[in-house]
Structures are given as structure tokens and as C-alpha cells.
Amino acid sequence: MANISWSHFLILMLVFSVVKKGKGDQTDKYCTIIIDPRTPCDLVDCRLSCYTGYNGVGKCIASKASRTPNCVCTYNC
């Protein structure tokens, strides 16, 4: 048993160094909101509004192919 190869040692170190996330973490909770749905999306304004209002990331996303895109803000709840 004293003769452990280097690869076995590395595998054991990898197994024991894994950190598991708890189920109670709030870091995985993201919310989305449509900012001003009546106006077409301008990417610069969308990102700025989302960042300043919600500290999130704004993207212009169309709900269907033929529709004008809306500003969708994704932020940490």
C-alpha cells in the first residue's frame, strides 16, 4: 500500500479538494425584468439603465423573430 503512483496521488488530491456548494446559497438566484417595454431597445441605453438601476446586465432580446427587441435586464435578486 506504500507504493502509490503519482497519478493515484493526484486523483486523490483532486477528490479531496472539491468544494461543494450548499443548497441555501443565494448566489444562483437571478431575476429578469423588461425595461420600458413600449419603446424599441437601444443597446447602449439598455445596458446603462440596467446597470444603474439594478446593477445587472441589459440585453436587447426580441420575443419573436418579427418583433422589435425589448430591453431585458438580468440582475442578482
Swiss-Prot record:
A single GO BP: defense response to fungus
GO cellular component, one term: extracellular region
Keyword Ribosomal protein annotated: no
Protein name: Putative defensin-like protein 158
Disulfide bonds: C31-C77, C41-C60, C46-C71, C50-C73
Organism taxonomic ancestry: Eukaryota, Viridiplantae, Streptophyta, Embryophyta, Tracheophyta
Principal subcellular localisation of the protein: secreted
Signal peptide: 1-24
Subcellular location(s) per record: Secreted
Transcription regulation in keyword set: no
Pfam families: SLR1-BP
Source organism per UniProt: Arabidopsis thaliana
Entry's family note: Belongs to the DEFL family.
Key words of the record: Antimicrobial, Disulfide bond, Fungicide, Plant defense, Secreted, Signal
